[in-house]
């Protein structure tokens, strides 16, 4: 999964796609763990970067994420699948 995350960061940089800042996602992942969060609704999937990382915060969290852009949606699905998530 780590390699996929690095690929996603490069892809986002090269294609001007906004993804969450590292400090922000670290905070959110810690919050999910400490508060035993069971579900998250994310609006704006982009390429799936934050959804994948949040899904890996704990084994019990369920992420629902919504993306209106068809191209980004397809890219996100591809990335989620590459990380073994669905």
Language-model features and meaning:
Residues 1-86:
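A short alpha-helical cap/connector motif
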């Amino acid at each position: 999964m780590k390699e996929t995350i690095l690929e996603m960061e490069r892809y986002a940089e090269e294609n001007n796609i906004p993804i969450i800042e590292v400090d922000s996602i670290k905070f959110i992942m810690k919050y999910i763990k400490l508060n035993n969060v069971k579900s998250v609704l994310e609006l704006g999937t982009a390429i799936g970067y934050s959804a994948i990382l949040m899904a890996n915060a704990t084994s019990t969290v369920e992420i629902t994420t919504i993306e209106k852009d068809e191209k980004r949606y397809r890219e996100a699905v591809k990335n989620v699948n590459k990380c073994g998530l669905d």
